[in-house]
Amino acid sequence: MFSTTLINTFSLGLLAVVSVVAAPGGISVGPISIGPGGISLGPGGISIGPGGINLGPGGGPGAINAGPAAVNLGTAGNYAILAKSGISTVPESIISGNIGVSPISTTAFTGFSETLDSTGKFATSQQVVGELFAASFAAPTPTTLTTAVSDMQTAFNDATGRVTPDFTNLGGGELGGLVLTPGLYKWTGAVSVNSTGVTIAGTPLDHFIFQIPATLGFAAASRVTLVGGIPASNIVWAATSVVTAGAGSHIEGVVLAKTAVTLETGATMNGRILAQTFVALQSATVIG
């Protein structure tokens, strides 16, 4: 147990006054305190405690945020699948979350056997644990979808417009067998994941952005595996061409696609598909 003691040290020149306090809660040296909770440097600064390292008020306890700043999906993040020209399914697919199409009508849903709600604002389907929205539904659905599509396009432009990548043309575009760490990744051509799969390693605070100016393909039976606690929502695949997930493959993350996305038979995804053209599911699963 510390006794309460105050020591003041005065010096001239560039050095300021330093106060050392030994008290029951620990030791305090000016803005620095050492106590049962760890080490803290000033309000909102650096703290080292039982949970790990917190760098500044935005970092949160437990880790240092690594990688680029998050991509803000806006209201597009309210959808497991959002597309501008249609969403199709070869039954039975399973979708957990809302799906939406805009600026087109409900005819853009294919294979869902949807039932319009009595309000006229949304529809339901046995293949969707959530609601289906189309631009032809009753207000406020059209306006809500217009905003969501705009937010989707803004998110795509943000993700593809980031500069100063941490990694350029990694693996020559083949990610199979690699373990990826947080950062901004940029390629000048197509990207693929072979059947070996790829591992993405990071904490719950880390972020990944993959800039792909061509096609993105996941081979049949390939897997994206997450380790370290990073959530799928912190991973963005931004592709300017077609995205294809082969039969039995598994994807983690948010797919921001300039064109179409296809999930082949038995493919699964934990994340969101936000496509500026079409999404096709072939007895696939999307958990949004």
From Swiss-Prot:
Residues 1-22 form the signal peptide. It comes from the Eukaryota. InterPro entries: Ice-bd_prot. The record marks 110, 192, 265, 280 as: Ice-binding. Pfam families: Ice_binding. It is found in: Secreted. Keywords: Glycoprotein, Secreted, Signal. Glycans are attached at residue 194. GO terms for cellular component: extracellular region. A motif (Ice-binding site motif (T-A/G-X-T/N) 2) lies at residues 154-157. A motif (Ice-binding site motif (T-A/G-X-T/N) 3) lies at residues 196-199. A motif (Ice-binding site motif (T-A/G-X-T/N) 1) lies at residues 75-78. A motif (Ice-binding site motif (T-A/G-X-T/N) 4) lies at residues 265-268. Binds ice crystals and most probably inhibits their growth in order to prevent cell damage from extracellular ice. Belongs to the ice-binding protein family. This is Ice-binding protein. The lineage of its organism: Eukaryota, Fungi, Dikarya, Basidiomycota, Agaricomycotina.
